[in-house]
């Protein structure tokens, strides 16, 4: 895991439901925790593009449902402001299920991946078809 150049807005609080954009069998997941989040007392932890989160699978194959797994946020609907002044936002909030060390469990990612997530997680960048 590397540091990222820009600092996107934290837009996904605990409890947010996201699309799972890989071929592991999960379709929809819910964020239940954010790794390495240092916040304020009584404030919900929130995630942004490139963060590792802990998710539970809400919709998917019977083998995947109800499992608690680590995942990385690859897209968010809230716009990301980059250091060069450009702004990027996506049509949905999406995650990719990964191993605890950050390598993707699936072999394919559907849709684009934010540049911030690809820079931070080389394993995700390897299997991404489109990096924006």
Swiss-Prot record:
It comes from the Archaea. Belongs to the universal ribosomal protein uL14 family. Signal peptide: none annotated. Keywords: Ribonucleoprotein, Ribosomal protein, RNA-binding, rRNA-binding. Binds to 23S rRNA. Forms part of two intersubunit bridges in the 70S ribosome. The keyword Ribosomal protein applies. GO terms for molecular function: large ribosomal subunit rRNA binding; structural constituent of ribosome. One of its GO terms (cellular component) is cytosolic large ribosomal subunit. This is Large ribosomal subunit protein uL14. One of its GO terms (biological process) is translation. InterPro entries: Ribosomal_uL14, Ribosomal_uL14_arc, Ribosomal_uL14_CS, Ribosomal_uL14_sf. It holds the Pfam family Ribosomal_L14. Part of the 50S ribosomal subunit. Forms a cluster with proteins L3 and L24e, part of which may contact the 16S rRNA in 2 intersubunit bridges.
């Amino acid at each position: 895991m590397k540091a990222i150049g820009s600092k996107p807005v934290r837009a996904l609080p605990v409890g947010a439901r996201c699309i799972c954009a890989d071929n592991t069998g999960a379709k929809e997941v819910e964020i239940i925790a954010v790794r390495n989040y240092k916040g304020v007392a009584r404030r919900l932890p929130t995630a942004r593009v490139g963060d590792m989160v802990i998710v539970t699978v809400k919709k998917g194959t019977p083998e995947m449902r109800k499992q608690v797994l680590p995942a990385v946020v690859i897209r968010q609907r809230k716009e990301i402001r980059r250091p060069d002044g450009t702004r990027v936002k996506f049509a949905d909030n999406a995650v990719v299920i990964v191993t605890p060390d950050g390598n993707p469990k699936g072999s394919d990612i559907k849709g684009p991946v934010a540049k911030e997530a690809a820079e931070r997680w080389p394993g995700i960048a390897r299997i991404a078809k489109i990096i924006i």
